[in-house]
Amino acid sequence: MQDFGQWLPQSQTTADLYFSSIPIPSQFDTSIETQTRTSAVVSSEKESANSFVPHNGTGLVERISNDAGLTEVVGSSAGPTECIDLNKTPARKPKKKKHRPKVLKDDKPSKTPKSATPIPSTEKVEKPSGKRKYVRKKTSPGQPPAEQAASSHCRSELKSVKRSLDFGGEVLQESTQSGSQVPVAEICTGPKRQSIPSTIQRDSQSQLACHVVSSTSSIHTSASQMVNAHLFPPDNMPNGVLLDLNNSTSQLQNEHAKFVDSPARLFGSRIRQTSGKNSLLEIYAGMSDRNVPDLNSSISQTHSMSTDFAQYLLSSSQASVRETQMANQMLNGHRMPENPITPSHCIERAALKEHLNHVPHAKAAVMNGQMPHSYRLAQNPILPPNHIEGYQVMENLSELVTTNDYLTASPFSQTGAANRQHNIGDSMHIHALDPRRESNASSGSWISLGVNFNQQNNGWASAGAADAASSHAPYFSEPHKRMRTAYLNNYPNGVVGHFSTSSTDLSNNENENVASAINSNVFTLADAQRLIAREKSRASQRMISFRSSKNDMVNRSEMVHQHGRPAPHGSACRESIEVPDKQFGLMTEELTQLPSMPNNPQREKYIPQTGSCQLQSLEHDMVKGHNLAGELHKQVTSPQVVIQSNFCVTPPDVLGRRTSGEHLRTLIAPTHASTCKDTLKALSCQLESSRDIIRPPVNPIGPSSADVPRTDNHQVKVSEETVTAKLPEKRKVGRPRKELKPGEKPKPRGRPRKGKVVGGELASKDSHTNPLQNESTSCSYGPYAGEASVGRAVKANRVGENISGAMVSLLDSLDIVIQKIKVLDINKSEDPVTAEPHGALVPYNGEFGPIVPFEGKVKRKRSRAKVDLDPVTALMWKLLMGPDMSDCAEGMDKDKEKWLNEERKIFQGRVDSFIARMHLVQGDRRFSPWKGSVVDSVVGVFLTQNVSDHLSSSAFMALAAKFPVKPEASEKPANVMFHTISENGDCSGLFGNSVKLQGEILVQEASNTAASFITTEDKEGSNSVELLGSSFGDGVDGAAGVYSNIYENLPARLHATRRPVVQTGNAVEAEDGSLEGVVSSENSTISSQNSSDYLFHMSDHMFSSMLLNFTAEDIGSRNMPKATRTTYTELLRMQELKNKSNETIESSEYHGVPVSCSNNIQVLNGIQNIGSKHQPLHSSISYHQTGQVHLPDIVHASDLEQSVYTGLNRVLDSNVTQTSYYPSPHPGIACNNETQKADSLSNMLYGIDRSDKTTSLSEPTPRIDNCFQPLSSEKMSFAREQSSSENYLSRNEAEAAFVKQHGTSNVQGDNTVRTEQNGGENSQSGYSQQDDNVGFQTATTSNLYSSNLCQNQKANSEVLHGVSSNLIENSKDDKKTSPKVPVDGSKAKRPRVGAGKKKTYDWDMLRKEVLYSHGNKERSQNAKDSIDWETIRQAEVKEISDTIRERGMNNMLAERIKDFLNRLVRDHGSIDLEWLRYVDSDKAKDYLLSIRGLGLKSVECVRLLTLHHMAFPVDTNVGRICVRLGWVPLQPLPESLQLHLLEMYPMLENIQKYLWPRLCKLDQRTLYELHYQMITFGKVFCTKSKPNCNACPMRAECKHFASAFASARLALPGPEEKSLVTSGTPIAAETFHQTYISSRPVVSQLEWNSNTCHHGMNNRQPIIEEPASPEPEHETEEMKECAIEDSFVDDPEEIPTIKLNFEEFTQNLKSYMQANNIEIEDADMSKALVAITPEVASIPTPKLKNVSRLRTEHQVYELPDSHPLLEGFNQREPDDPCPYLLSIWTPGETAQSTDAPKSVCNSQENGELCASNTCFSCNSIREAQAQKVRGTLLIPCRTAMRGSFPLNGTYFQVNEVFADHDSSRNPIDVPRSWIWNLPRRTVYFGTSIPTIFKGLTTEEIQHCFWRGFVCVRGFDRTSRAPRPLYARLHFPASKITRNKKSAGSAPGRDDE
């Protein structure tokens, strides 16, 4: 296909420029060789007789004809000519013979002499093989080109021409006016067109779609009609005047849709339709300004839009002249009118030197036949005499600059041949039909041309690719030579121009056979031809180069409307330019200085090699040529000139890669039409060298790309044959372009404006991914000053996506809607969406549009709440966690201390309230020591991390079963007694079994020694109680396994001392010289939570060399009558009967002691009457056994209790006398020296501390008060009593007085007692933690206590003072710090929190110091390991991992456990960490933190629960609860996030930072109970998801509930939860019945089940109950209690929702607990006697088994410890609150039964029993006859674990039991008589604690904890391993839903 412009011969007499875009589909045979002959103007070309008609006197006449008979004859005349009415059917002209135009040789000169100005010769480019070469004959340099000669010759005779159109064979001929000579060039298409070689088909095709714009609704001639009919014969083509069907607005929308769907078919169908009756003048007369759409816009425009385009074209001062010429010379094309406003400072070199206002029409002979179609200069009869041809060319072009406002060309981003759709925002492209292409009608090959500005030396505009002085014109030398694939390599003056043609077959899809529609306002090849022909003899600086693309696709652009006027766009290959409307002059003005540019444009330079986009700022006030009009428009003052610019110049590299229509354009309004030579040159240089893409900013009023309907599949495939030839660039003239380095971002110019983006990247995705792109492109765009806008950088979006803000709406929203409605087509296919390849670079739709790697969908990031930490809290945290942070204490002034104390008081109240309520609902969870070693707890915290407690506890049980402890030979079982613990875990002696005698000192003098019981407590009233026994024997250092210090370790439940208590180990010497070391044992307390009582415990430690050990038999034989082996229950009853106080039973049972202030005086009675007689110790006394304590003469247990618990009610009763604590003998009690010393010691220890030891026992001490808190007394306040600092100081004085009193005592240095911090972090003055390593001096002891914070901090660093030396020797140097040793390489996990400088220690040296001070003592029984850790250490990791597989994370945990054990052996030589109990809390914390895998939370758990230090771990439950309750303030949450919707809670360490400074003053007991209650509360009520807020006792103060409640008020009611079903039965009638009935026959109870009816015998005996008091209101309380007990009567699947009045519940909390205390404690419901109504008496007892989805309730029998069924079972632990239970099987039930058994035979009819074990009726008869039932034993968890478990057993619930695995599988037969009178309880079986309690009401939860039990696992007594529950006990709902058929199979562990 040859140059489209070749077969559009131009007349030298025509000077008007016309815009035309002719769509030619693939059906049109484009292989037309045209031969343009211009007799006087055009040529250097050889004239052909076949291509011209003879001249007449008036001008040149051109005729275009084709097979369809379309003929256009254009003549030039001096006068006005008639316009062609496209609405009228023209008369057909007889077909003329079509012949092939001959190829002209350049050997003959043209008729017109060439310009005298020589043009440097350029080298000829080698053409590709197989193609003809079109070479222009070389001429002499002095000979002017023929075009110029012709132009000069014919300038005076320029006339208008007429066109003749032949639609359907009829020829419309219009003669020119007389006097004008119009040579006629005929372009014929005939049969010869097939003779062109097929190689031509490889060249590109340029598809030009045209629409006729008309104000009428009639359909005018369309481009498809003309194209399919071969509209343009080569011989009949008019001189550059082409029919512009692109701008037809008269087409119906259905035609738009048809054209969109099938453009080719549309063209073909309308090829022979005539236009109508309207003339061209009428058509354009009806057009409105700015409303001439192109092919795209015509589809997207509404018919209601004004189409008066002539008014727009003629808006200047010379509108009339232009209108006349337009009507005569422009047929369906936009003639570029002259601009009367001409810049006054135009330079001569720029062809703008002359005022264009004076020469508006000086265009004659400027644009000759060398110019391709679409543009030509309008004929102007008035020519200034001073204008030469060269100047006229530039003037004409300059006129276009000022009169045309659109110059758009944009890159294509089509990536494939298929599915190429027209994209919104794409610019029109400059396409010309290649007439050389013959025989390519099927291939549809098109050519795309680009226009580039190239700077040259002389500053003249010339067409790129022009030859030198010779006749070589690769582009435009001949019509048949300029459009080949040959490229221009030799440009004059080093012009860098590219012209390439490529052809590829279009897709078979007919929608793809329509090439880009070219607006008639497009600067086409014809224009460039004319420029080249006119300026080839002049070394012009300004050249227009045409470049084609290598890319595959040419995407059709669309129109953007501005101010209601369509903005035609043209897009082409690299630097392709379209010149819509009035901007042809831009093609010649390469750079123009703008008078007032507010902002400089920016250029985006794309570098394909790096795939990056760079912004470059152009020079100040510089704008490229095609930007000129847009910039000049900003300064246009004439109201008639309302012009805007919308243009983009796009590289060819991005052609064919656009897959979506989001090609972006930027707009800039033209300013005043003044130009500058320098600026023009500078811009030209930039364009030439960098091949920039010029993209002015988007017009702010333009429509976005999403608002314009798309036109489908208008694109052109371009083959890859493109060859680019480039000459070496010569030095550019003008202002040089600023070069930027790769990756360098230019500095943006101008000020950003609102709604715009300055310097944004303007790039499409495909432009960065096209592999064919090999040249860098740049984009520059400037601001739009007229609209006060700045160029918005927008980038193309992905396929099918629209870029918001890419194009600002240019039309009203209503117009856009109308457009969209008009083009609706139900048959139109959607845009194809191609999937993004993995890792592809895709546009990011951010504000500034950065290019980011595509990584798929980004997850929504959840915001995490943050704690609002105040500076005082942060400072206090540092002080508490870092003992060496004494310098920070300076920041704590009195105001801060006062404020912090107020905060502590607030939290004290919150904690007390929380514990009280939780105690009421969740049961008693006060401290009760478990056995176990420190290593057990360390491994335990490994297992409890990030998993629920039931899984972690099962994992530890599995380890204990897999690696059991090897039995020791010295162990022997002890007799069953209340205070003994056997080796097998039943019960042990009071002081343990491993106690050994050290000589016979204790045995010989035990009877002669009076034991002194001394309770100690710190100044803050901690719950630490020590029972110190002082016996006199020489060399006796201590008792069962603790160091020889009085306050070395308070009892396990007493380690909460916040104040360090200085003890007096070996400080008292008897008269006989015997010294008794008084020591304490941290695990020496035995407590019974079942009866709220405690026993003595003695723990054996690893240091045996200095211990005085004695067996339980020794104690029992010497100190207690053998006949008085009272059981645990008997002791409790004894105490209750002997209680003389007026306290109620529950208050006396509060630790088993009457809490009466009147008994305070008995403190000394119980101590001084030790030698009288012996009574059994009450089990509820939480004494700490130290030293050789003997209890020979206790009057009775109540006296002892009263003596120890004297100070219990000190806070409640302010009338406590001070004399109660004086050491004076009580009347009636003999006072000897020993007892006085004991009394004095006891009194001293009430307030003993590290302060000065001055004697002043003037004030009572609250040590005992806080040591013994009632477990169940509701009359006692749950607030922990604390003493003031004054009392503390007074106690210090009392201690000092005691020391002085015994100043003559001999203290043995070898037995010196070192105190040790037992409570962990003992804070003094509320700020610091004190260590207790203070020796007790015989004479005077320095006052180590100081309220000064700095001194306290310094004292904290004195952890190991005197550990390795004798206390007496080092007593004066008490404040010396222990020697610090370098680290031995042990792993330090992290620096201590809050520590400014981490101190490292040799941990093994620390252990050695402890051993040196205390000796190598043997471990006590309570400190024994639960697992054989040495075996685990030697085992393989896989074996350990398999053992804990059920827990999860087993591999990692197995490695950590083994690494930990290996470290112990490597560092210390053995697996033993018991020495940590005697190390300072800070040192212990640092050591634990150094263990790999332990964090702060885990370390705090070990310290609080095992080491009994002052600590408070914050786990997920605690953190969540504190946030929800509002205890921890949060930073403001986002508006969209409410507290009850919060998912990401703050970091646990931050929560702990806030809490610990406020909780550090609490004692260890309170912290323990608070922690235990909180973790249970988090499992039962405040779960992570769906918390049970309706039943929560804390919801009145809960902010989470308030937030949820406030939100729920606005929400619609939702469906009720499955687990919460409101019962329609009244609550009273539903629940007011007895659960535990033992007076009726047991058989009736056993026979009752869900399958049997209510037997009458169930109600034979009345249900009576004894009220707690005679007051009638207690009946109401009984009703409440009954409601709690029995609420599952009507339907086992229903869980009644009891809505409580929470306000009333909160107010009456304590009174409610007191009123129901008897029932809650141990009210025996089977013995209740009360008259009830007959209705209640008729309610049957609950079922034996009640199955629900989440839990299964079983009615069980409570077995006493002496029950015959328990023979062979381990005896229950004394402190275990849970008894053994018996679960009864229903007859016919099996271990795998999930449903109630049914009768399966007809035994009643036959009278014979079947043998089926699942038949309910037969088995019921058998069991009734045998008087036996089947049952499964339930074992208390503490007893099952033998009282030993990590972390003090907090894994388990206080009421948790295990199902015996053997009896669960094979039930045991139980005689009915054995369970006849046993009380009945309820056990809740489930998979976990949260699932069991999910959805229960407050009463039901309370009943479960106080009356019932929970069970989540089975227990194999043989292997001692956990087992899953059998289906009979509970079958998980999850397994039922998964496989209902396998309901009978054995269930595994459920993970609900």
Curated annotation (Swiss-Prot):
Residues 72-157, 693-778, 1302-1334, 1367-1398 are annotated as: Disordered. Bifunctional DNA glycosylase/lyase, which excises 5-methylcytosine (5-meC) and 5-hydroxymethylcytosine (5-hmeC), leaving an apyrimidinic (AP) site that is subsequently incised by the lyase activity. DNA demethylase that is indispensable in both male and female gametophyte development. Involved in the regulation of DNA methylation in the promoters of RISBZ1/BZIP58 and DOF3/RPBF, two transcription factors that functions synergistically to positively regulate genes that are key players in the development of aleurone layers. Reducing ROS1A activity may be a potential tool to increase aleurone content, and improve the nutritional value of rice grains. Aleurone cells are rich in an array of proteins, vitamins and minerals. Coiled coil: none annotated. It comes from Oryza sativa subsp. japonica (Rice). The lineage of its organism: Eukaryota, Viridiplantae, Streptophyta, Embryophyta, Tracheophyta. InterPro entries: DME/ROS1, DNA_glycosylase, Endonuclease3_FeS-loop_motif, HhH-GPD_domain, HhH_base_excis_C, Perm-CXXC, RRM_DME. Expressed in roots, leaf blades, leaf sheaths, apical and lateral shoot meristems, inflorescence meristems, lodicules, pollen grains, ovules and seeds. Expressed in vascular tissues of roots and leaves, pollen grains, pericarp, aleurone, and starchy endosperm. Residues 90-102, 130-139, 1388-1398 have a biased composition (Basic residues). GO terms for molecular function: 4 iron, 4 sulfur cluster binding; cytosine C-5 DNA demethylase activity; DNA binding; DNA demethylase activity; DNA N-glycosylase activity; metal ion binding. Belongs to the DNA glycosylase family. DEMETER subfamily. Residues 709-720, 727-747 have a biased composition (Basic and acidic residues). It is an enzyme of class 3 (hydrolase). This is Protein ROS1A. [4Fe-4S] cluster binds at C1582, C1589, C1592, C1598. Residues 769-778 have a biased composition (Polar residues).
